[in-house]
C-alpha cells in the first residue's frame, strides 16, 4: 500500500491517473506536462529493485520529450483558439501520471522484494506505457507548430525508440528471482539456505540493514491485509498471492534475524 502526501492510499501496480478536463488551456496542460516530466527525471538516480535497464531507457526518452515540450511551450505561446494538439498532449499527460506511479512502486523503500517478484507484471505495464507514448506523440500535429527541424527530428526519434523498445525483465532480475524461489523451496523443506545466496539477493534489491527489513515486513503485512480484503470483496477464494506474500515475509524475517545479525556481528 502506498501512502501519499495527500493521505490517499494506492495499491502497488495500480495507476489512478486523472484525465485533464476538456476545457484545459494549452499553456496549463503544457506546464503540467513539463512538471510531470521533471518529476519522472528525478527517478534517474534512484535504486530500482527490478527492470533497471528498461526504466533507464524510458527515462532517457522522457528527457528528450521534455525538451520537445519546452520548445512547444515557447512556440505556441497562449493561443486564443482551440489547438488540435490538446488531445494527444492530454493522452501523454495520463501516460506520464501512470509512469510516475510505476516508478514510485519500483523504487519504493519497503517494496523491493515484492516488486522484484512482480518483475514480469512491471515489464508488461512499462511496455504498454512506452508504446502509448509512441502512439500519442505520433498523433501530435507538428504542422500546427513552427518547430525547429532538430526538434521535429527529436520527436521522430522518441516515436521510433518508444515503438521499438522491447521491455523485458533484466537477466540479473531473473537469476535473483530464481534464487528467491529456490530459497523459499528450501524453507518449505526445512533446509537452511546458503548465506552467500541470501546476501546476493539482498544486495540486488538494496536491502542492507535491519531497518530496511522492518520496512519490507511492514509493507508485506499491509499488502497481505489488502489482498485478503480484496479477495473477500470479490468472493475470490484464491490464496496464491497471499501465500507468496506470506512466504516473502518469512524470508525477510529470516534475513533480519540470521543474515543481518551475522553481518552486524562481523562488522563490530
Where are these regions (language model features)?
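N-terminal amphipathic alpha-helical segments
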Residues: 2-78, 136, 140-147
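Alpha-helical bundle protein-protein interaction modules that mediate dimerization/oligomerization
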Residues: 77-255
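Onset and early core of a folded interaction/catalytic domain in large eukaryotic regulators
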Residues: 233, 265-268
Amino acid at each position: 500500500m502506498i501512502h501519499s502526501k495527500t493521505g490517499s492510499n494506492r495499491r502497488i501496480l495500480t495507476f489512478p491517473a486523472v484525465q485533464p478536463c476538456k476545457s484545459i488551456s494549452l499553456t496549463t496542460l503544457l506546464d503540467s506536462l513539463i512538471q510531470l516530466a521533471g518529476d519522472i527525471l528525478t527517478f534517474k538516480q534512484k535504486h530500482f529493485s527490478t527492470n533497471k535497464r528498461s526504466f533507464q531507457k524510458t527515462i532517457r526518452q522522457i528527457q528528450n520529450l521534455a525538451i520537445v515540450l519546452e520548445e512547444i511551450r515557447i512556440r505556441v505561446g497562449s493561443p486564443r483558439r482551440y489547438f488540435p494538439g490538446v488531445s494527444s498532449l492530454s493522452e501523454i499527460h495520463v501516460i506520464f501520471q501512470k509512469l510516475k506511479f510505476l516508478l514510485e512502486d519500483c523504487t519504493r523503500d519497503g517494496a523491493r522484494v515484492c516488486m522484484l517478484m512482480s518483475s514480469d507484471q512491471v515489464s508488461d505495464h512499462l511496455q504498454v506505457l512506452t508504446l502509448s507514448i509512441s502512439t500519442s506523440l505520433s498523433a501530435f500535429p507538428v504542422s500546427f507548430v513552427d518547430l525547429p527541424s532538430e526538434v521535429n527530428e527529436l520527436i521522430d526519434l522518441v516515436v521510433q525508440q518508444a515503438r521499438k523498445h522491447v521491455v523485458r525483465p533484466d537477466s540479473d532480475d531473473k537469476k535473483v528471482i530464481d534464487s528467491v524461489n529456490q530459497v523459499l523451496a528450501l524453507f518449505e523443506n526445512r533446509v537452511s539456505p546458503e548465506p552467500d545466496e541470501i546476501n546476493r539477493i539482498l544486495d540486488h534489491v538494496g536491502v542492507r540493514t535491519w531497518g530496511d527489513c522492518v520496512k519490507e515486513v511492514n509493507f508485506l503485512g499491509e499488502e497481505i491485509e489488502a489482498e485478503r480484503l480484496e479477495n473477500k470483496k470479490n468472493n475470490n477464494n484464491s490464496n496464491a498471492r497471499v501465500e507468496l506474500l506470506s512466504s516473502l515475509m518469512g524470508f525477510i524475517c529470516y534475513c533480519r534475524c540470521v543474515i543481518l545479525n551475522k553481518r552486524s556481528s562481523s562488522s563490530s
